Amino acid sequence: MIIERPSSARGHVRTGWLESRHTFSFGHYYDKAWMGFGPLRVINEDRVAPGAGFPPHRHANMEILSYVLEGGLSHQDSSGGGGVIRPGELQWMSAGHGVEHSEFNASQDAPVHFLQIWIQPDRVNAAPTYAQQAFEPADRHGAWATLASADGRAGGLPIRQDARVLGTLLAADEVVDYALDAGRLYWLHVVSGEIEANGRPLTAGDALGFADEAGRLQLTGRGTGRADVLLFDLPH
């Protein structure tokens, strides 16, 4: 089964300093048909005004990934983690038995544009932890790079779930493949740009879910510039 999630169908929330697009139900946006996909619970595309952000708030038992597209995102948490996340970097905070954190635009002049991703962990009430990793764009040009994986065994950040988060950057006519296993779930999210996925045209914010599907997923870059694409390989 292939599930389509067009960008235009996502939830949309706007406040004075925040504009968010929600792939799945979150906060003020609720749709019982879109509560998540396997352990993938949240993909929020956020734009935060200069100098603004999320004051200290608490999370527990969630793997939280932040992926910055433009600008800088300043993070502080009660586990001792903190810093500024820039484009090309991924931040991981495992909330464990409970952690308080804040996120603010690191600039007083320019907005920050980022994805926040939540994955439910495979264990509960572990100790909170934090890490941040930079990824060379050249390693993703026309190829998959592992950005996060189960306890870091396959590379990338060491999330607490039997999952892999992969990324690629595709110029026009560049092709990457991924083998689908019917015993796994897959969620494909176009961060920016244009691609075709097994012949289906997709643009920024569009997503496809794959359940009980086997065979080859082939992505082809389209349009100008490079498309930025994430793939989540998840337990069923």
PLM ranges: what are they?
Residues M1-H236:
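Jelly-roll (double-stranded beta-helix
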